[in-house]
Amino acid sequence: MGLLSYILLGFTHPSELRAMIGYKVWRDPLNDIKANPQASGWDRQRMRDCWGFLDLTSRSFAAVIKELKGELSRVICLFYLVLRALDTVEDDMTIPAQRKIPLLVNFYKYLEQPGWNFTESGPNEKDRQLLVEFDKVIAEYQLLDVGYKTVISDITAKMGAGMASYIELSAKGPLKVAMWKHFDLYCHFVAGLVGEGLSRLFSESKLERPWLGHQLELSNHMGLFLQKTNIIRDYAEDCEEGRYFWPQQCWGDDFAKFESQPDVAKGIIEIKPGHFRPADNELGQRSMYVLSSMLLDAMSHATHALDYLALLKEQSVFNFCAIPQVMAIATLELMFNNPDVFKKNVKIRKGVAVGLILRAVNPRDVAYTFLHYSRKMHARLSPADPNFTRWSVELARIEQWCETYYPSFIAAASEGKPTDIRANALRSWSESRRTQALILKQAKLNGSDASTLDAKSVLEAAQNSALDPRDLMTEDERAAQDKRDRDQMVKFFLIILVGMVTFMGIVALITWEIVWWWTMDTPDPLSVYVKHAYYLVKTQGWSTVKEVLRTTRLSFEHVWKHGLTSPPKLEL
């Protein structure tokens, strides 16, 4: 982004510009691979080359992988490079099927062959160099512990076999998927297995609980949520290259009735360069129905992803898993009822992505990010959509999940906004528990019976003896005190600002007079104006001046008493 783009972003989306500045200036990475070269392998040129391959293949994934704790960052880096090399072989259309299938099936065996590489990739393959220098990845792989090697080899074998089966099917014609269950199986091979492998590596590293590696179903949902989002987003590119991943059961059902996946885009028309909308006829409705069905299928994995994230305990692992998930839910919301999906690649803005990264730090914030985007989709959901009921149920599941694990009334109570009767009940209960704890503490100090102590006297005694009065305040009292402190601080800085401006004005005026008197022979215009104003006031009276001064004084008094905050609006 150029300077002009940032300036425009500041006017159109100031919160995103603020997030980008905050990320660049104030956010520090959780871990740095250069700070622990033995664990990350940065002390070896060969491993530094592998980190370079990771940067070339995916900068977004590279950033979160590098922040993983200890040796796990190196392990995940090699795991990603192995699977990326496998995926490069699968996607290379210049390799004939009879050569590609044995390569995919036996790829896991090559990890045990030092010096093996592959130089037959097409010249236009983005990650061709990774396969050319794959011997470096193999050498680093051999340095891993046996547990890590077992997981990586096992996942590579399963994924290679799954990819080979689809290559064999597509050898007779363009690759396409018939039914929803086949679509799930394909996504499992290319992404669900990645989630399974990551969970097993997390457990193997001892950073996460041992049983996390056995959560295969939740791990699969994590991978499918990301993969299905990417498949929907890449519709136009895949159709152009002859890859059809959307299941025929979706675009060829009794309502859609399309003959092929590329035909789905026929219901979308261009209104101006780069902007599209569905046609005002049945064809346009059927196209948007297919998009709605695909998005709904992807959304079915959302709450399962939240279940998985709630199991994680290591912060760097949580960030690694959560950031792609919040990106996915934001992308799904952007594609919801968006006909541009059929004609071009739809991506969230960079500022939005940075804001999501800053918020994806704990399960509650991630859950409420999901809730935020689900509500945005629900606001645009049309009853005319044949999937309206199913969409309502799926979005309500996210609402229910958040309310079950992170109830809104607890958030309301902590923020001092009693919008829910449960918040008042929670506040009263918390205050009674605090008072009871103080009574028990005072009784223990005095050696007296707690039942004989008066709550009011105990609170007064505690307030008098407390080192910090805030420790004995309720949430509401602490919030009110914070507001008073902020107002006092604003008043203080206002006085300082006025004083500085006044002083600088006086210095500027004196300098002006001296320079004019020293360099000019005529009277300075400022003195002439002041004299003119003085005689004007003298002749016309002081009533106007007094009224202006009175209004100014009342304004300053209002700011001094009430601060700079405006009174709340009356809501009916």
From Swiss-Prot:
Any GO MF annotation of the entry: squalene synthase [NAD(P)H] activity
TM stretches of this protein: 316-336, 492-512
Pfam families: SQS_PSY
One of the record's GO cellular component terms: endoplasmic reticulum membrane
EC annotation from Swiss-Prot or TrEMBL: 2.5.1.21
Disulfide bonds: none
Name of the protein in question: Squalene synthase
Organism encoding this protein: Mycosarcoma maydis
Name of the coding gene: ERG9
